[in-house]
Amino acid sequence: MRSSTLQDPRRRDPQDDVYVDITDRLRFAILYSRPKSASNVHYFSIDNELEYENFSEDFGPLNLAMVYRYCCKINKKLKSITMLRKKIVHFTGSDQRKQANAAFLVGCYMVIYLGRTPEAAYRILIFGDTPYIPFRDAAYGSCNFYITLLDCFHAVKKAMQYGFLNFNSFNLDEYEHYEKAENGDLNWIIPDRFIAFCGPHSRARLESGYHQHSPETYIQYFKNHNVTTIIRLNKRMYDAKRFTDAGFDHHDLFFADGSTPTDAIVKRFLDICENAEGAIAVHCKAGLGRTGTLIACYIMKHYRMTAAETIAWVRICRPGLVIGPQQQFLVMKQTSLWLEGDYFRQRLKGQENGQHRAAFSKLLSGVDDISINGVENQDQQEPKPYSDDDEINGVTQGDRSRALKRRRQSKTNDILLPSPLAVLTFTLCSVVIWWIVCDYILPILLF
């Protein structure tokens, strides 16, 4: 089923080529030299086609649109009449970051289209003790929390199970349009339930090359998609009345950029979301750290996903979500959120009584002091109320993240979109050539 260039693949040299059989026709390979073409084999690579756009030292996982594009590419190749007799080999090179993302895509394909379990997909990929470096967050500096390929595969499997992921109804054009800074910088984390988006400003403008959007930019889109509730987590950069006057509920839950929320904020956020009539749109400054953290709390409570699985899923939907200490915070909150979710579902089933409530309260009081991975829950005292001034002076994590996203998308646009001057020059040249042909050359040819 699998093969390596070594006689004993379990002790392979890191520089040896590895081939892994996914199906009888599809293979995944790590190659340290360019493969030679053959009549019965089709090689292809996506290393320079589907590329992660990093904020800092982060390098993956690739986003949902890229997973979709990859799966479509594989299905098309497997169904191609010209390749029916060929083996299809997806190969990656020596770059460990590219290897991890390539393996991520192959594993997602196995889970989504081949019905493999996350564990089975992972076992196939790690044949020969093939090492894959884990994914890290988008924060600046050192990292002490990672998500693995297996975490990602579990996230994708559970997303399918709970209806978050359905490529039969996935709208690629909409995803890629609205994720761009100039088009709103928003992503659905749970379809029809949660949107994460960049914080609006008092007026729409282009500031230092970055598109700042007013609340009005989002209003029609939100109405078209049954968004009823807006939750702001950063300082006030627009008047909430501009949303409420348009018929939306608006809530402010401030906490500092790059920090973790208090228990009171988490509880209030969950209460708002659980009572919202429609979808909820959540933002902080960049719509990454604080936004991802609170949406992750909801997912962990209501779907019993682990912290690592949840972080993996929200980053697949919107790269960069959940930053620095927010990762360990979610690990610490996992058990208590699961218990809260169990009680919530129990209550919905009409099984609540005084004994249930008393027992649940006792459980939660014990969970407050539980140590997970050697980290004690020390959120016993409420910190001082968050002040807007905390984000006014100096450059925050959100500022840096937005600036990076704007710069990289500007570079992409520079490559993909010709300048107005180039278009005008091309048009004028075409007119001149056509005039010469019609006025001089064509009469000679005809007569």
UniProtKB/Swiss-Prot annotation:
Q: Where does the record place the region B?
A: 183-349
* Miscellaneous comment: May act as an autosomal functional substitute.
The molecule here is called Dual specificity protein phosphatase CDC14C
- The main location class comes to endoplasmic reticulum
Q: A: where is this region?
A: 14-168
Give EC number(s), comma-separated. Answer: 3.1.3.16, 3.1.3.48
List UniProt keywords, sorted A-Z.
Endoplasmic reticulum, Hydrolase, Membrane, Protein phosphatase, Transmembrane, Transmembrane helix
Annotated transmembrane regions = 426-446
Family (UniProt): Belongs to the protein-tyrosine phosphatase family. Non-receptor class CDC14 subfamily.
Specify one Pfam family: DSPn
How is it placed in the membrane, per its record?
Single-pass membrane protein
InterPro entries tied to this protein: CDC14_C, DSPn, Prot-tyrosine_phosphatase-like, PTP, Tyr_Pase_AS, Tyr_Pase_cat, Tyr_Pase_dom, TYR_PHOSPHATASE_DUAL_dom
What UniProt notes about the protein's domains is: Composed of two structurally equivalent A and B domains that adopt a dual specificity protein phosphatase (DSP) fold.
Every copy of the Tyrosine-protein phosphatase domain together lies at 184-344
Could you name the Gene Ontology cellular component terms for this entry?
cytoplasm; endoplasmic reticulum membrane; mitotic spindle; nucleolus; spindle pole
Region entry Linker, spans: 169-182
Q: Name one GO biological process term.
A: microtubule cytoskeleton organization
* Places the protein is found: Endoplasmic reticulum membrane
Catalytic reaction(s) noted? O-phospho-L-tyrosyl-[protein] + H2O = L-tyrosyl-[protein] + phosphate; O-phospho-L-seryl-[protein] + H2O = L-seryl-[protein] + phosphate; O-phospho-L-threonyl-[protein] + H2O = L-threonyl-[protein] + phosphate
Residues the record marks as active site: C284
